[in-house]
Curated annotation (Swiss-Prot):
Official protein name in the record: Glutathione reductase
Superkingdom of origin organism: Eukaryota
Source organism: Dictyostelium discoideum
Pfam families: Pyr_redox_2, Pyr_redox_dim
A molecular-function term among this protein's GO annotations: flavin adenine dinucleotide binding
Length: 465
């Protein structure tokens, strides 16, 4: 094997976790000046799901829908458009959004080059326990002292007749115009977010969910509040149903979905599959490396330090299946590099009290245990919950109202806050600071002992009784 084909650290996948780990490794290895080499293998644009077809472009579209809601609220605040209707142009924001993503791709490439990280263009697969072959059986082979698998995941598409008539969340970002009507199939945060954006921008939106509720792993207060708000806002729901087939209508322009009960739903212009994601482990040559996968979902099995069962092979991010969140992949990747290349042998990412946000309408912020999880873990007698629900002051002069609801889940006599769940305008920003408090072990008294900022929604979290 040529010395140019051997690396100290070789990363498979230039997504958020892979790049973060590679750059942190470069920081330490480059400083040592021992000639250590770092490489990263990627077949497409750098940035992974988050930058290209996930968090970043999604947030741009959420911002777009937020502006639309502000326009709707403007007359209540005395703004007169002179009888003119404000028009929304989807191609304009799509062009601006796509250009922004390309700039980010360029920044990632530039940062990799600055850190002397070798970019290997192509699709990498294991050809042995510590060997990666790029671009097929006749492709170049690379070895490394340490290999990181950070190849991410992809949307799931059900195996039903006509499945190709639907698109995934990836395809959402390829839409050239706003569909007049959309059917979103799924009950997770991706389904909820896309349905909210499309409805706010003017697409007649229906959600199909297998059970009575969506966001079922979230606290009951959150999904109950959101379901009512989305229903009040005009989103339609088909519950306790799944899609058995898709077909074109008679004119070929719209799509008709048939449920498992044999009910044909009204035709729509667009169907989005948002039923979950699977790890990209099926075409990585995992068997040739002897890497173990989880039995149920095929994620890469790792220990608390992100090690696989093969010495010198590690994994982070969505491909591990533990919190499919960009900040988690970044944090785990950086800690891995600190452990491998900076002597911090005990450093690891702690998968507890990870805060998360759903960019729904209104947004959700949550950290810690749900009420039911807390009761299951500690017993009903040891849990006390504090709740509040109110109309944000922003809606005081509007006919349209959006409710804000908050819950604190507290443990024991000292009332340690082990869960904090909020939904309402601004909750996507509010949650970060309170997540720090929960991570530090704050109690209800710590919140009570904090002077409120008035008038805000956040003050309710420090004034609950």
């Amino acid at each position: 094997m040529s010395s140019t084909n051997h690396f100290t650290y070789l990363v498979l996948g230039a997504g958020s976790g892979g790049i973060a780990s590679a750059r942190r490794a470069a920081k330490h290895l480059n400083a040592k000046g021992n000639g250590d080499r770092i490489g990263i293998v990627e077949v497409t644009r750098p940035g992974g799901t988050c930058v290209n077809v996930g968090c970043v472009p999604k947030k741009v579209m959420w911002n777009t829908s937020f502006i639309k809601e502000m326009i709707n609220a403007a007359p209540s605040y005395g703004f007169d458009f002179g009888g003119q209707q404000v028009k929304f142009n989807w191609p304009t924001i799509k062009k601006a959004r796509d250009e922004y993503i390309k700039r980010l791709n360029g920044i990632y490439d530039s940062n990799l080059a600055k850190d002397n990280i070798v970019r290997i263009n192509g699709y990498g697969r294991f050809s042995g326990p510590k060997e990666i072959q790029v671009n097929g059986a006749n492709g170049e082979k690379y070895t490394a002292d340490h290999i990181l698998i950070a190849a991410g995941g992809r949307p799931t598409v059900p195996d039903v007749p006509g499945k190709e008539l639907g698109i995934t969340s990836d395809g959402f970002f390829e839409l050239e115009d706003l569909p007049k009507s959309t059917l979103v199939v799924g009950a997770g945060y991706i389904a909820v977010e896309l349905a909210g954006v499309l409805h706010s921008l003017g697409s007649e939106t229906t959600m199909v969910i297998r059970q009575k509720q969506f966001l079922r792993t979230f606290d009951e207060m959150l999904h109950t509040t959101l379901l009512k708000q989305m229903t009040d806002d005009g989103v339609k729901f088909v519950t306790e149903a799944s899609i058995k087939s898709l077909e074109r209508d008679v004119d070929g322009k719209r799509i008709i979905a048939t449920t498992n009960a044999g009910v044909k739903l009204p035709p729509v212009e667009c169907v989005i599959w948002a039923i979950g994601r699977v790890p990209n482990t099926d075409d990585l040559g995992i068997d040739k490396a002897g890497i173990q996968l989880t039995e149920q979902s095929g994620f890469i099995k790792v220990d608390e330090f992100q090690n696989t069962n093969v010495p010198g092979v590690h994994a982070v991010g969505d491909i591990c299946g533990n919190f499919l969140l960009t900040p988690v992949a970044i944090a785990a990747g950086r800690r891995l590099s600190e452990r491998l290349f900076n002597g911090k042998s005990d450093l690891k990412f702690e998968y507890e009290n990870v805060a998360t946000v759903v960019f729904s309408h209104p947004p959700i912020g949550t950290v810690g245990l749900t009420e039911q999880e807390a009761i299951t873990k500690y017993g009903t007698e040891n849990i006390k919950c504090y709740n509040t629900s109110f109309i944000n002051m922003f809606y005081s002069v509007q006919v349209h109202k959006v409710r804000t609801s908050m819950k604190l889940v507290c443990l024991g006599k000292e009332e340690k806050v082990i869960g904090l769940h909020i939904i309402g305008d601004g909750c996507d920003e509010i949650i970060q600071g309170f997540a720090v408090a929960v991570k530090m072990g704050c109690t209800k008294w710590d919140l009570d002992n904090t002077c409120a900022i008035h008038p805000t929604s956040a003050e309710e979290l420090v004034t609950m009784v």
